[in-house]
Amino acid sequence: MGEFLPTTYEEMKARGWQQPDFVYICGDAYVDHPSFGAAIICRTLESRGFKVCFLSQPDWRDVEAFREFGKPRLAFLISSGNIDSMVNHYTVSKRRRKKDLYTAGGQMGKRPDRAVIVYSQMARQAYKDATIILGGIEASLRRLAHYDYWD
């Protein structure tokens, strides 16, 4: 540990890896700090000897963005980030927010609404037989018997 997690194919290859064990797909910008759950999960896996790559705010309109590292040996780990993507995008009165506090420069539009669903669909489209593990606040809110306030 000590180096940042690979966030590009070139960084993964520089470590001498052919394939990651896990690819963590996150709706937030990459922040390697223990106040971010993604960093804790990735660093814990890394400390156990797993090869973890971090795919931050991939372009959800382009399946090739989800093929950045190739198919992970074990699974895609998918989270919308520190906050539900709908809460991140809209106020309680359903007005669009002006800034994304978990994106560099506060730029809006780097993650889709319902990011966990969209990222999962794109990972599945990229690799039909890949294992997908969901986590985070959004994944826990978007379950089978879920009333979606936004609709």
Language-model region placement:
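A short, Lys/Arg-enriched amphipathic alpha-helix followed by its capping loop at the start of a domain
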Residues: 44-50
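Short N-terminal or domain-adjacent regulatory/targeting segments
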Residues: 1-16
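Glycine-rich beta-alpha loop elements in corrinoid/cobalamin-binding modules
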Residues: 10-11, 29, 37, 42, ...
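Conserved beta-strand elements of the Class I
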Residues: 21-23
